[in-house]
């Protein structure tokens, strides 16, 4: 058990540090500190020895040089059970430092400001802090090292239970956390500096890219049972990584992927919306004046494919909707909240996974999207674009009616979340046929028609969305034969005139958005 007699505390994040230091003092721990931390502790009555007084060497260079001294680093690095180390410590008057509590200058927060200058960024690169942290973490067998205020309580509790000591397993865990922290810190610095162009302005993508993820949980298996898998969080907050599982079996790899796609889709809509997702694709999507109606129509969009799917809603789940969900075979349901009267209804299906996710409009993704390929990593911005009706260009002789425009806006939002080549048919806030993942656009158009007819939907007067341009008129002809009267697509084909002519021949209103929404999974 590592007994603690001397601690060095130097933090930029002062949450809880005064109470932590006061409790250490109650254990008889001698406390060393620096600069602003020392002032904060002394102002609250904690007895502190300034590092400069301890080393006999003052702070220099406007505080840049404070702790880089043999009396500090020797006290952190010396092995307590090595006689040559203890002999040298005695010879040079270097007492052991048993606990180090340090967090670093706020570099990431500083560069997050759009008007951050290079000088400001460089001044917020911590030198002494990482050096001490690495020294203490390397010598974890003799030193307890803390970099996170959230760990103060656990260390104090262990000291209470162990007469002022901290166990080896805790020291090792905290040391591991330190190396992850300093790696992330140095990675942020490298990312920032390598993103600066010759003019000093930041480019979108840095020359070197350092990423860090923390394991949220092991998964039973991956996409298939023979694949091992785990789920990692990136620390940005939000998304399924921060959702609360209220009941049901453990999440699977496929649950997480489908759940992410499902929630992202429904959060595109301001009105109550529900969707059912299977294998990364929406089976049915609907909006309505209330959640129950939206769910009923989403399920009806393709009840065959929806069997065993993932349901997401963008409103708190009520009892009526929960009753309907519990009568159908669903793997998982996600909503911003589960209302109290809905909980016992869902609980009857003990294996049903139920998750509450953070709402706001905060689901919109920030940062970058990654795709691993052999030998490298593809990086892009998330597709956050969604073109408003004011951005549309009517290219047909006939403009869409008010209702057709509503239908076009609806299917266009859905189409963004369907695997390419994607065609979505819909009317009055409900999908009635989806052609997903086809190698040709005309096949996607025909698949959507076939699905609609199989389910008994009448496509006369329906709207169609295509995630990319029509390379030939055949897709328009197929949709027209089914009765479609309004089409929304990006445009941009060398045969746009031929495609527009087809729309005009069939009396179809066609609009171009100018933006493509490929989705390749």
Swiss-Prot record:
Keywords: Hydrolase, Multifunctional enzyme, Purine biosynthesis, Transferase. CDD domains: IMPCH (cd01421). One of its GO terms (cellular component) is cytosol. Pathway: Purine metabolism; IMP biosynthesis via de novo pathway; 5-formamido-1-(5-phospho-D-ribosyl)imidazole-4-carboxamide from 5-amino-1-(5-phospho-D-ribosyl)imidazole-4-carboxamide (10-formyl THF route): step 1/1; Purine metabolism; IMP biosynthesis via de novo pathway; IMP from 5-formamido-1-(5-phospho-D-ribosyl)imidazole-4-carboxamide: step 1/1. GO terms for molecular function: IMP cyclohydrolase activity; phosphoribosylaminoimidazolecarboxamide formyltransferase activity. InterPro entries: AICAR_Tfase_dup_dom_sf, Cytidine_deaminase-like, MGS-like_dom, MGS-like_dom_sf, PurH-like. Residues 1-147 form the MGS-like domain. Its EC number is 2.1.2.3, 3.5.4.10. Pfam families: AICARFT_IMPCHas, MGS. It catalyses: (6R)-10-formyltetrahydrofolate + 5-amino-1-(5-phospho-beta-D-ribosyl)imidazole-4-carboxamide = 5-formamido-1-(5-phospho-D-ribosyl)imidazole-4-carboxamide + (6S)-5,6,7,8-tetrahydrofolate; IMP + H2O = 5-formamido-1-(5-phospho-D-ribosyl)imidazole-4-carboxamide. GO terms for biological process: 'de novo' IMP biosynthetic process. The IMP cyclohydrolase activity resides in the N-terminal region. Belongs to the PurH family. PANTHER family: BIFUNCTIONAL PURINE BIOSYNTHESIS PROTEIN ATIC, BIFUNCTIONAL PURINE BIOSYNTHESIS PROTEIN PURH. This is Bifunctional purine biosynthesis protein PurH. It comes from Acidithiobacillus ferrooxidans (strain ATCC 53993 / BNL-5-31) (Leptospirillum ferrooxidans (ATCC 53993)).
